[in-house]
Amino acid sequence: GAQDNSMADEKAIVKSGNMRFTVLTPEMIRIEYSAKLQFEDRASFVVINRHLPVPNFTQEERDGYLYLTTDKLELRYKLGTYPVSNDRCNPNLQITLDVNGVEEVWYPGKQDPYNLKGTTRTLDRAEGDVREWLENGLLSRVGWAVIDEREPRKDGSLSLMFERDTNGGMDWVAQRKDTAALDMYFMGYGHDYKKALGDFTKIAGKIPLPPLYVFGYWYSKFQRYTEQDMRDIVNEIRSRDIPMDVLVIDMDWHRNGKTGSTDGTEWTGWSWNKALFPDPAGFISWLHDEQNLNTTLNLHPADGVFPKEDNYDALYADLAGRYSDIKADSLTN
């Protein structure tokens, strides 16, 4: 797994004008472009480790091009140009690889109809085949895949950076130094999918196994339950000898985040609705200690945090110390 060292070995880095290439493995190259020459060495939401053993590679400038060649890939970059171009026959940047004896050429923006796909953020309103919702994944029958750290996800979210806390606290979310920069990882593993996934964990971190209980029986229903309702449900399930592992407490556990009311009219909220759950700590303790149940609170954070929340002042004070643009009326981003 990754060792959380976001700084690549200098021997793996090749700079050319506004471009920076990092040869991470024989099959993986990081590609950056920054008009401001502000390249990122901080960890991101996706990549936490770039300090890998430097693979064998050569670099050469010839006839106006930079060539980087590993045991598996040949990268060609037209010196002094923006890497994304409309000339598919002679792109400014291309990578060539062998896929089962067939030469495959990639360039920025090339579409991949053979990608084996990844995930989707939500299954809300899912009925039947939802493959068109899926984002591109790490594996493809075409033999290559790209992790584009600058491309917004389908829900509009971005991969941001982590600013290291030098005082022993928690690293904090930060914008990129150059918000217009390009930053992508080319993975040319052919059909060696196992190696592709293995090398991905070297840069992204080890994938933890879920605890066994999450594969058990969950009780979850979108209904305006009270604490007593949920105690009654647990007791009835137990009385029927139905094994249960997780109890989901749906969104009415919290107050209306904007107004502080307990009417259940607001999806976003962070403070317990004492009209329905008069003793939250006691209830959670009863679930954990007496019923041996795990629990989770259904949360919809999209609208942010408003001053009616119980701990708003403390949260605001902490964030205001980190960011100068925090507004006192709400924390919505």
PLM regions: where:
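Short, Gly/Pro- and small/polar-rich lid/capping loops
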Residues: A2-A8
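Catalytic and substrate-binding clefts that recognize carbohydrates or anionic sugar/phosphate headgroups
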Residues: E60-P211, K221-F222, V234-S239
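Flexible loop/turn segments at secondary-structure boundaries
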Residues: R30-I31, Q38-F39, V146, R153-G156, ...
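A low-complexity, Ser/Thr/Gly/Pro-enriched, surface-exposed linker/loop concept
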Residues: T25-D63
